[in-house]
Every structure is written in C-alpha cells, then in structure tokens.
C-alpha cells in the first residue's frame, strides 16, 4: 500500500483503489457521480436540494470542505479507480473532536455499479487507518439502517462493533430512520507527543 498522506490531505493507494481528499477541481466529477447514482442512493441519504447535484453546488461545498480539512475539523474523501480516474464512492469524517474525546463520525457512499467488489471495505480500512495514525483519533463512530445489510457487512469487515440501537436517529429520504450504532476503537492510541 502506498501512502502519501499529510495532516491536511489523504492520499492512499491500495492496488488500483485510490483514497484521496476531495479538491476544488473535483466538482464536475462529484456532481456527475451523484447525478448518476441519484436514484440508487436516495433510500440511504437525506433529501437533497438540486444544488447538491450541480457542479456549482459542489464548487461551493468543496470550498467549505477544504476549509474544514485545513482546520482539522472534517475530511471528505473520494474513492477513485487509479488507472481510469473513475470515481467509485465517498468517505467523509465529520464531528471531529479532539481532547478529551478524540473521536469522529464516518459516513460513506458507493456507486451502484461498484457494489460487491470490496471497494468500500478496502477504502474504509484505509480511511480509518488515516484517522487513527495521522489524525491520532481514538474512536470512529458509524450508524446504519437495520435493513442495510451491505453497510452492516462493510462495517463488520473493517472491525466496527455494535454498540446500540437509536430510534428515529436520522432523517433519511424525508423519513426518520432507526440506526444501529457502531464504533471502531484505535487499540494503539497514544496521547499526542508520545
């Protein structure tokens, strides 16, 4: 595995799968990804405004996301096929908190045509490795809807453990949805500076 990451940018390569921080120049590709997967992702995501599917909407969003990257408060990453540059999915870390929590939440999406090939399992493994080893976090939290067996399988493969069940947890596609709550703990966590 090749790793050229820094404290403000993710860049990890596993075979032909590249995990990297989204940049301003990615607005076209990201808008195209969400347009192409709009119906497929709809049951798993919040209702989106039209700007979410537009290049201009993503230009504005990426400016804000890049500021969060620079401040160490959030990371929005893309899963890309390195040989072709094709975008396969997204992995985002939000609600980043340092002392005393050292934790964050993770969310992700994968293109319909990329399902069933292990891309998200590999990508999420690389992404969590970055958050633990570069960002020095102790805990990463993820939630999934009980009927989303693919997400359950990905999280289990990466090592997330079930912690609870939250009723009406997130507003997904206009409906409050229950979620199973999971976490991944960094077993090698050390205080910064050690």
Give the location of each predicted region.
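Acyl-donor (CoA/ACP) binding surface of acyl/acetyltransferases
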Residues: 1-29, 33-43, 76-194
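A short helix-loop-beta-strand connector motif used in the catalytic cores of GNAT acetyltransferases and
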Residues: 50-51, 62-78
């Amino acid at each position: 595995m090749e790793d050229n990451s820094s404290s403000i940018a993710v860049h990890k390569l596993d075979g032909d799968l590249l995990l990297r921080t989204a940049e301003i120049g990615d607005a076209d590709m990201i808008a195209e990804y969400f347009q192409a997967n709009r119906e497929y992702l709809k049951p798993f995501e919040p209702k989106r405004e039209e700007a979410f599917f537009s290049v201009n909407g993503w230009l504005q969003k990426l400016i804000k996301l890049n500021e969060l990257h620079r401040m160490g408060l959030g990371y929005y990453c893309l899963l890309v096929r390195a040989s072709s540059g094709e975008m396969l999915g997204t992995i985002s870390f939000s609600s980043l908190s340092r002392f005393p929590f050292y934790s964050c939440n993770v969310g992700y999406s994968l293109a319909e045509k990329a399902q069933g090939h292990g891309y998200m399992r590999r990508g999420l493994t690389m992404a969590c490795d970055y958050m633990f080893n570069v960002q020095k976090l102790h805990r990463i939290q993820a939630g999934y809807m009980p009927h989303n067996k693919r997400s359950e399988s990905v999280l289990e493969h990466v090592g997330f453990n079930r912690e609870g069940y939250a009723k009406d947890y997130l507003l997904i596609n206009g409906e409050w949805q229950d979620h199973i709550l999971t976490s991944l703990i960094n077993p090698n966590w050390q205080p910064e500076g050690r």
